[in-house]
Amino acid sequence: MSNRDTLFSAPIARLGDWTFDERVAEVFPDMIQRSVPGYSNIISMIGMLAERFVQPASQVYDLGCSLGAATLSVRRNVHHDGCKIIAVDNSPAMVERCRRHIDAFKAQTPVEVIEDDIRNITIENASMVVLNFTLQFLNPDDRQLLLNKIFQGLNPGGALVLSEKFSFEDSVVGELLFNMHHDFKRANGYSELEISQKRSMLENVMLTDSVETHKARLRKAGFEHSELWFQCFNFGSLVAVKGGSAT
């Protein structure tokens, strides 16, 4: 069971940049449920997408896997032989807990949990790739390169699921959804101090893009088909499909 997130309930004299360290890993399930609207729905529907897109004898990549929620959702819905899930995160604390979490659930489809920068991972024979609130933490200059790499490593008919916090070109809409997200966090028990301190730590490391920017990158990578399939306030998820049929 996850501990309750109280990391920012008291004033912090020096707020550094956000890191996914042991303290965050310990409370991460509670933190993300109370901070990201629609997170549980996205996780469960990633499993539904896996049932539709994962091909026999192929690989699934969960890039930025944190504690493995998306990996487990995929594995519950893979019914083909010869498949493998590769879950990657660069946080030692997340990887250690992810391995324990994955090992607690037995299933036919093997999972390899790798501690590494997702930019170092070779994508090959992939029928599905998941970037679940991960791309926003990469240097913007590296985002197109990663999407290009994913497209090249996907099999025809394969899919990329890209979940992100969004910015908005329309400032009125952006402010409305920003405020509604803060209302959501308040309703989930976060104080103004907690919200403010966490935002200050994230603002230099989590750089968001608009849906239009994401779609433009996906097109540039080679994806002919992409669409927003889920959105709640300023959070959402896109699916991009590589053209052609699975062999």
Curated annotation (Swiss-Prot):
Gene3D superfamilies from the UniProt entry:
Vaccinia Virus protein VP39
Pfam families in the record, alphabetically? Methyltransf_25
Q: Which reaction does it catalyse?
A: prephenate + S-adenosyl-L-methionine = carboxy-S-adenosyl-L-methionine + 3-phenylpyruvate + H2O
Q: Does the keyword Transferase apply?
A: yes
Per UniProt, where does S-adenosyl-L-methionine bind? Y39, G64, C65, S66, D89, N90, D117, I118, N132, R199
> Which UniProt keywords are present, listed alphabetically?
S-adenosyl-L-methionine, Transferase
InterPro entries attached here? Answer: CmoA (IPR005271), Methyltransf_25 (IPR041698), SAM-dependent_MTases_sf (IPR029063)
Q: What is its EC number?
A: 2.1.3.-
Task: Tell me the GO molecular function terms.
Answer: carboxyl- or carbamoyltransferase activity; S-adenosyl-L-methionine binding
Q: A Gene Ontology biological process annotation?
A: tRNA wobble uridine modification
User: What PANTHER family does the database record attribute to this sequence?
Assistant: CARBOXY-S-ADENOSYL-L-METHIONINE SYNTHASE (PTHR43861:SF2), TRANS-ACONITATE 2-METHYLTRANSFERASE-RELATED (PTHR43861)
Give the UniProt family note: Belongs to the class I-like SAM-binding methyltransferase superfamily. Cx-SAM synthase family.
Assembly information from the UniProt record? Homodimer.
Annotated function: Catalyzes the conversion of S-adenosyl-L-methionine (SAM) to carboxy-S-adenosyl-L-methionine (Cx-SAM).
Protein name as it appears in the record: Carboxy-S-adenosyl-L-methionine synthase
Biological source species: Cronobacter sakazakii (strain ATCC BAA-894) (Enterobacter sakazakii)
